[in-house]
Amino acid sequence: MTGSLFKGNFWSTDILSTIGYDSIIQHLNNGRKNCKEFEDFLKERASIEEKYGKDLLNLSRKKPCGQSEINTLKRALEVFKQQVDNVAQCHIQLAQTLREEARKMEEFREKQKLQRKKTETIMDAAHKQRNAQFKKAMDAKKNYEQKCRDKDEAEQAVHRSANVANQRQQEKLFVKLATSKTAVEDSDKAYMLHINMLEKVREDWQSEHIKACEVFEAQECERINFFRNALWLHLNQLSQQCVANDEMYEQVRKSLETCSIEKDIQYFVNQRKTGQTPPAPIMYENFYSPQRNAAPPGKTTGPNPARRGPLPVPKRIPDDPDYSVVEDYSLLYQ
């Protein structure tokens, strides 16, 4: 659309004004600044991704996570640790990709900067030449106008002295008038020459301004397209990162689906079982019960030194003079 073209909307009625050109340059500078900001954003995001990836890698490799689990849950945890490791590697790789995209943005900015510099150099020269020629034309105009006023004064002096001045004075006035007329003619030619030169310079400047507008508009279209595509690509990379992460986590989910509570319980029992017979009940033992010395189940019978029976009563042997019993014992008091 014509109304959207730079060359049709950035003019000024003042021949010395650069307001339209300056407006375009300011917009291009802002665009370049925006590209630099996105470039810095990518670099900082890359640093964040790299740090996160390395921290996640250290977490996966150094921090224990269910290391004493067994059987199917152990295998699921091993898959989990491996996939977390893979996710960390993906984030580190993403950081490298983001730095590469930042480098491309930087190269694009520098390329446009060089292209703009050529056009700006031409426009700066055109502005200087236009301004200088305008000054010359205005100086020539002032000189021409002054010579015209001098001629008019000389003519008026001749008319005033027609009846009062002598012949010698009139001759001087006529010489001055002739000189002023010659000066007017010369200044008029110089003025016309500078005006013609100014017009040529103005046309050249206007042509260069149109070319510059076309170059700058093409650059701005290219910049917007490049910036948009770079942002689009960045989002695609982040989406791919999410998809890759989900695929890795899906491997963990599949491993968890194979996890069997029954198998893990059975595996633990088979590996760590200690026996299938529980201990017998502890029975009450009456101290005076004749069955209290009976051996409990699982134990062999034998003498219990802590619980002995009554001592045997010896038989009386009266014929043995050296033998006596307690009944024959008495205390002697002296």
From Swiss-Prot:
Origin superkingdom: Eukaryota
Annotated segments matching region Disordered? 288-322
Q: Which SUPFAM superfamilies match?
A: BAR/IMD domain-like (SSF103657)
Q: Which GO terms describe its biological process?
A: cytoskeleton organization
What does the record say about tissue specificity? Expressed in macrophage-containing tissues, including bone marrow, spleen, liver, kidney, intestine and brain.
> What sequence ranges are listed for the domain F-BAR?
4-264
Which keywords fit this entry according to its UniProt record? Coiled coil, Cytoplasm, Membrane, Phosphoprotein
Coiled coil start-end: 66-163
As for membrane topology, the entry says: Peripheral membrane protein
Record's Pfam families?
Answer: FCH
| Modification Phosphotyrosine occurs at | Y323, Y329
Q: Which GO terms describe its cellular component?
A: cytoskeleton; cytosol; membrane
Q: What does this protein do?
A: Binds to F-actin. May be involved in regulation of the actin cytoskeleton.
* Name by which UniProt lists this protein: Proline-serine-threonine phosphatase-interacting protein 2
- List the lineage, top down: Eukaryota, Metazoa, Chordata, Craniata, Vertebrata
What is the primary gene name for this protein?
A: Pstpip2
